[in-house]
Amino acid sequence: MSNPRTKSPNTNRGQGLRSERSALLNDSLSSLNGNSSYDSIKDSSKNNKDVAEVNEYPRRPESSVSVVSNSPHRQDAATTNTVSTVSVSKVLPALLLGVVLAALDNTIVASTYTKIGAEFGKFSQVSWTATAYMISCTAFQPLFGKFCDIYGRKKTLLAAYCVFGIGCFLCGTSRSLWQLVAARAIAGIGGGGMNSTVSILMSDIVPLKQRGTYQGIINVFFAIGSSLGGPVGGYFADQYTWRIGFLIQVPLIAIAFLCVYFTLNLPHHNHVSFMTRFRKIDLKGLILLIIGVTTMTCAFTLGGNVREWNDPVVISLLIASSISYLSFVYVEAFVAFEPLAPMDVLTERTCLSSYLCNFFHSVANFGWIYGMPLFFQSIKNEGAEKSGIRLIPMIIGSSLGSLLGGAVISLTGNYKKITVGSYFFGSVAALFMLRYGYSNFNWEYAVYPFSGGLGNGIAVTTTLVAIIHASPSAFQASAIATSYLFRSNGCVLGVSISSSIVQTVLGIKLRKSLDFDVDELLHHLRKDISYVHRLPEEIRQTVLDALLGSIHYSFLFVSFMFFCAFVCSMFIKNRNL
């Protein structure tokens, strides 16, 4: 049996803990030897069963559990635990339905937040409906990766479906903005669990060289859900009420639950009590992560919007966030026996580079999703439905990019070159969006978002394959969940920072352009952005120009984030599959 990394005799406490975990891992694998659930998968394939029997444990038997070697031609252990194409085809539709709904719920607020803000009279605070979803999604995704190890893939996925459905129902029945924010947080927990668990499950049943293709398919359906979120939410908001957009998801998620329950048959764990398994969860790390994500988001939401950046509250939140994140890293490295984000993964060069790429391109992507509807609803005076439709070219580009990235990996076995090129492409596309408001060519409203989406879609697929290829097999579930942690952190900051940039720059420009106190004007604009078109004609154009300039700064920020991802992608090791 291949042993995990051996440590020097002069190890610190954290290294000792990791060695102890590795020893326990070897013992558990030895006990599973000869009775592996991976063997049952191969037997089920031979018997031509039409259900996917997937190992509930992510840890491979002897020859499969190994740390990534320096050789670029590491044996693909996953090829030993695949199921037939027929079996995958039975399971995949049930998984994809959940992916579509999670993606739809992720973007449904993008085209409805003006309606929600107007109904509750709190436009400046309505961005919390998006950030609350992302906070909970971010904080709990690593936990779902650990749940997959402890309770198994199927139970974890079904639990995520239940939490998501409850959250959607509460969203549709909320009677105040803060009730809606709390409901969005509940939905975010389930949505994050659905996304990460599906990727972990597919990683178990698909060979490494084909994972790019299957991940591309998953990303396409995620893109379909994302593209539907804006138009569907905008349509219901314009024609009926924004609440229907949330309530309609409840019966659909129930269908997904039933499909997974009946089509995904998995071997059972050895019988261990719930509390025995629960004690394995890194609660200290989880609490620190929740505090870090929440305080960081609060700081960027309040700063430049409700409070000045030098306000003691904003500064305190930034300090608290920094301390929480540093403490989280310390706990994961030196305290946690079963860490949410293992250091064996975080310290691997390709994994870390890919994680940073995921973070930066997620910041860029959600900054884009925030900025585009704002541009069309404020500058172009379009309705929520039409501004949501404007997001479709970007989503189509992302879908095609995911398939292209997977196809290139399957054909060439190389993922670095196309990753580097995709981020450069996205950065340039975002720069061209600075022409918005000055150009009279309507095709530019589609081509630039499509190009940026294409680059983003390629990178989402290729970086995940890089992480799977580079991570130790025993920690693959945690490695995948950690990638979603970095993505979700980026999504939270993408919305919050973009909103803060627009609000801050708008205030600066208006104070320079107008010769009266603009605080009341800013107050009205923050409550309802469409107020700009009800202003007196003599100041309306001045305010529109200031608003356009502030949105351009958010697009410039998007371009810079893509460039940061481009730089990080240069450090990914070029291992051919």
From Swiss-Prot:
Sequence ranges of Polar residues compositional bias: 1-14
Keywords, comma-separated and alphabetical: Membrane, Transmembrane, Transmembrane helix, Transport, Vacuole
Keyword Coiled coil: no
Transmembrane domains' residue ranges: 91-111, 123-145, 157-177, 186-206, 217-237, 244-264, 286-306, 317-337, 356-376, 391-411, 418-438, 448-468, 490-510, 547-567
Keyword Zinc-finger: no
Cellular localisation: Vacuole; Membrane
Listed Basic and acidic residues bias regions: 40-62
Any Pfam family the entry gives: MFS_1
Biased composition, class Low complexity, residue ranges: 22-39
Organism domain of life: Eukaryota
Annotated membrane topology: Multi-pass membrane protein
GO molecular function: basic amino acid transmembrane transporter activity; L-asparagine transmembrane transporter activity; L-isoleucine transmembrane transporter activity; L-lysine transmembrane transporter activity
Annotated spans, Disordered: 1-80
GO BP: any one term: L-lysine transmembrane import into vacuole
PANTHER family in alphabetical order: MAJOR FACILITATOR SUPERFAMILY, VACUOLAR MEMBRANE AMINO ACID UPTAKE TRANSPORTER FNX2
Described function: MFS-type transporter involved in vacuolar amino acid uptake.
UniProt record similarity statement: Belongs to the major facilitator superfamily.
Protein's name according to its UniProt entry: Vacuolar membrane amino acid uptake transporter fnx2
Species annotation: Schizosaccharomyces pombe (strain 972 / ATCC 24843) (Fission yeast)
